[in-house]
């Protein structure tokens, strides 16, 4: 039954009017056609929406029933559980980062989670309202109600596309920020080391100008030993920073691959079930049409 109502949501999101389809194609990012695996799966999802639009408008009315609110509630709860699980994984990945960065990212994730819940709640309310109006008609024709619903859902599609693009931009900013932070750390160490070397050079020049040659040589040896010690510590610190950045990079890549695999595993079975449901439904409808068509009468 969940798959059946997923088909209902897909059909309504696809729109009931053919003239809204060019707008959808114009808004779809090109990266969904040749990007990461989860983006490719999302591209196949939108391709399937365009295919669903070619089906009969009567499919929507046949799928409506009194259980639509309950089924959508179950789907919403399952989706929010997945969002919370992914949020927990991100919090574990952010362990090596600064507290300020972790707090900012956690706040933005909570806001995105709230927007997602509000979007799904709006879809459920629109479908419930549409079902009630279809049953009572409220003085409107079915085409008028369908056009109103298509307008609301078209606005919702724009909002979802905007949120997806905003998420991609935020991920790019975080990636650039991490690289920039690592570069700043290395630059700061280099500047500090250069300052120590310059101070040592000035002190050596001052010592060599003293009349007592032995004292100058002693100070020079001590200074060189100090510089070598500082240089060794700086190199060790640089190596440690590089190792930490490499560990963070590997963890992020591993989590990203796992999430991409999860998205792929979620989308592809859903699409396969939807295709199977539609094939059975179309076959039943064709069989019903074939049996209900009266045989032509012969003229005497």
Curated annotation (Swiss-Prot):
Gene Ontology process terms (BP): acylglycerol homeostasis; cholesterol efflux; cholesterol metabolic process; lipoprotein metabolic process; melanosome organization; phospholipid efflux
Protein name: Apolipoprotein E
Organism: Dinomys branickii
Keywords, comma-separated and alphabetical: Chylomicron, Endosome, Extracellular matrix, Glycoprotein, HDL, Heparin-binding, Lipid transport, Lipid-binding, Oxidation, Phosphoprotein, Repeat, Secreted, Signal, Transport, VLDL
Main localization, broad class: secreted
Complex formation: Homotetramer. May interact with ABCA1; functionally associated with ABCA1 in the biogenesis of HDLs. May interact with APP/A4 amyloid-beta peptide; the interaction is extremely stable in vitro but its physiological significance is unclear. May interact with MAPT. May interact with MAP2. In the cerebrospinal fluid, interacts with secreted SORL1. Interacts with PMEL; this allows the loading of PMEL luminal fragment on ILVs to induce fibril nucleation.
Localization of this protein: Secreted; Secreted, Extracellular space; Secreted, Extracellular space, Extracellular matrix; Extracellular vesicle
Keyword Metal-binding: no
């Amino acid at each position: 039954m969940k798959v059946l109502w997923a088909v209902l949501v897909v059909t309504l999101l696809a729109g009931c009017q053919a003239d809204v389809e060019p707008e959808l194609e114009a808004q779809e990012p090109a990266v969904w056609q040749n990007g990461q695996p989860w983006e490719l799966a999302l591209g196949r999802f939108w391709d399937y929406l365009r295919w669903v639009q070619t089906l009969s408008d009567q499919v929507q009315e046949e799928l409506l029933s009194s259980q639509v609110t309950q089924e959508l509630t179950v789907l919403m709860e399952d989706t929010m559980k997945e969002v919370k699980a992914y949020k927990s994984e991100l919090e574990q990945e952010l362990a090596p980062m600064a507290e300020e960065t972790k707090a900012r990212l956690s706040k933005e994730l909570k806001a995105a989670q709230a927007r997602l819940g509000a979007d799904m709640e709006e879809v459920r309310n629109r479908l419930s309202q549409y079902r009630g109006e279809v049953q009572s008609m409220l003085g409107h024709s079915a085409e008028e109600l369908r056009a109103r619903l298509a307008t609301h859902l078209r606005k919702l599609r724009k909002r979802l596309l905007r949120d997806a693009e905003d998420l991609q931009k935020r991920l790019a900013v975080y990636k650039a920020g991490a690289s920039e932070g690592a570069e700043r750390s290395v630059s700061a160490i280099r500047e500090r080391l250069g300052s120590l070397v310059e101070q040592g050079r000035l002190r050596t020049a001052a010592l060599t100008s003293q009349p007592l040659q032995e004292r100058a040589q002693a100070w020079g040896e001590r200074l060189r030993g100090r510089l070598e010690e500082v240089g060794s510590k700086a190199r060790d610190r640089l190596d440690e920073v590089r190792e930490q950045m490499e560990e963070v990079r590997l963890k992020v890549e591993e989590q990203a691959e796992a999430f991409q695999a999860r998205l792929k595993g979620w989308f592809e079975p859903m699409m396969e079930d939807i295709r199977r449901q539609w094939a059975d439904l179309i076959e039943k409808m064709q069989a019903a049409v074939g049996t209900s068509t009266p045989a032509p009468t012969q003229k005497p």
